[in-house]
Amino acid sequence: MLWVEKYRPKTLEEVVADKSIITRVIKWAKSWKRGSKPLLLAGPPGVGKTSLALALANTMGWEAVELNASDQRSWRVIERIVGEGAFNETISDEGEFLSSRIGKLKLIILDEVDNIHKKEDVGGEAALIRLIKRKPAQPLILIANDPYKLSPELRNLCEMINFKRLTKQQVARVLERIALKEGIKVDKSVLLKIAENAGGDLRAAINDFQALAEGKEELKPEDVFLTKRTQEKDIFRVMQMIFKTKNPAVYNEAMLLDESPEDVIHWVDENLPLEYSGVELVNAYEALSRADIFLGRVRRRQFYRLWKYASYLMTVGVQQMKEEPKKGFTRYRRPAVWQMLFQLRQKREMTRKILEKIGKYSHLSMRKARTEMFPVIKLLLKELDVDKAATIAAFYEFTKEELEFLVGEKGDEIWKYVEKHGMHRIEDETFLESFVKAEKEEKEESVEEVAEEKPEEEREEPRARKKAGKNLTLDSFFS
């Protein structure tokens, strides 16, 4: 079991933080009522923000519901889960929120909230702001490493508490308590060295301490070879440890990665067939599938403590399924699924931009733009001549990339025509007006060309007929 979880504080007294922070948090919790501002706990990683929130829930007798913003990329998902959790009273075993007359308060903890401000999370912050303005009936704590990635509006809606990096003495005291409980003999200078290398990150220090002390009854100064903690361990090195060794310490190495278990399982899945075959491959995939089951439970129930079981199965579980490591160099590959997901994300983003233009200039909702106009416009661009298709492209102000996305190579031809003729959209002109206007201009040009080729007397005849027929009714044209 990871020591980070094993020795996570259960009460506020066990949390390593300034007394002023603990006092403010207790005051907020005891005075909380519907409409109270959420707490925004801000500070660098490993200073106890999440631990404090969980300890607060335990102290107050509240049920803690943990969400991780970096793993719930869709703002709709965040709004559904946080919204339902904030406005209902109980949670089922399957992780679904249920309405109930009897139930205790739930402390909703949204971690890594500064990550929903990225491009792939468009709308996430807006959804959160809407939720807070609705005055949820449950206490809400937001956690961020960098609060200034959030908009001023969101920060102003919260009561912000800033955490400072822990001193190496504070970190060393925690490590000393863990060493005592684990029965490990260790000099205080060694603990101070580990604490210094962690740079004020208590979680990192505990992970380093566990990795160094694994299987030892005593930790000596010469065992601490760290010069500076590597913040981002090499994923390729972890792959080598899984496939080329039978050392169970790979689990600790994997937990130090700046990769989530969802990322690591893709790496293992991609490279497993390069190293294993036959029965070994079957057994390794069995371990990997069990890891995936735990990850699925994490996604459904938002219970991130199950990550450790998934991580163990995808590293040590897969590693121990081989009789002997395969010799020789293996070039490990990045997960192919990432490229596919990236392409799908690009496709969705391009479609969204096109639909926004169609909706804007056709005065339609996004839904109607998608279901009614998008297929028609795509067909017209494909089937019409380049000059007519260019009229549509100019009207909707499609870019070259958007045209190529819609009709492939023809999109480049359409774009060149638009550029060559300086075509642009006329404000307040409807699509039908624009298209009819282009058709009319083309017919007039055609009539003028034909007229120039006719003799003078033939050109005069239509004018006389037009003059004589000014007062004729419509029926007279067919008599």
Curated annotation (Swiss-Prot):
Signal peptide limits: none
InterPro entries from the UniProt entry: AAA+_ATPase, ATPase_AAA_core, P-loop_NTPase, Rep_factor-C_lsu, RFC_lid
Gene Ontology biological process terms from the UniProt entry: DNA replication
Biased composition (Basic and acidic residues): 452-463
Spans annotated as Disordered: 441-479
Positions bound to ATP: G43, P44, P45, G46, V47, G48, K49, T50
Molecular-function annotations in GO: ATP binding; ATP hydrolysis activity; DNA clamp loader activity
Key words of the record: ATP-binding, DNA replication, Nucleotide-binding
Function per UniProt: Part of the RFC clamp loader complex which loads the PCNA sliding clamp onto DNA. The complex possesses DNA-dependent ATPase activity which is further stimulated by PCNA.
Family under the similarity heading: Belongs to the activator 1 small subunits family. RfcL subfamily.
PANTHER family from the UniProt entry: CHROMOSOME TRANSMISSION FIDELITY FACTOR 18, REPLICATION FACTOR C SUBUNIT 1
Subunit record text: Heteropentamer composed of four small subunits (RfcS) and one large subunit (RfcL). Both subunits interact with PCNA.
Name of the protein this chain belongs to: Replication factor C large subunit
Organism: Archaeoglobus fulgidus (strain ATCC 49558 / DSM 4304 / JCM 9628 / NBRC 100126 / VC-16)
Organism phylogeny: Archaea, Methanobacteriati, Methanobacteriota, Archaeoglobi, Archaeoglobales
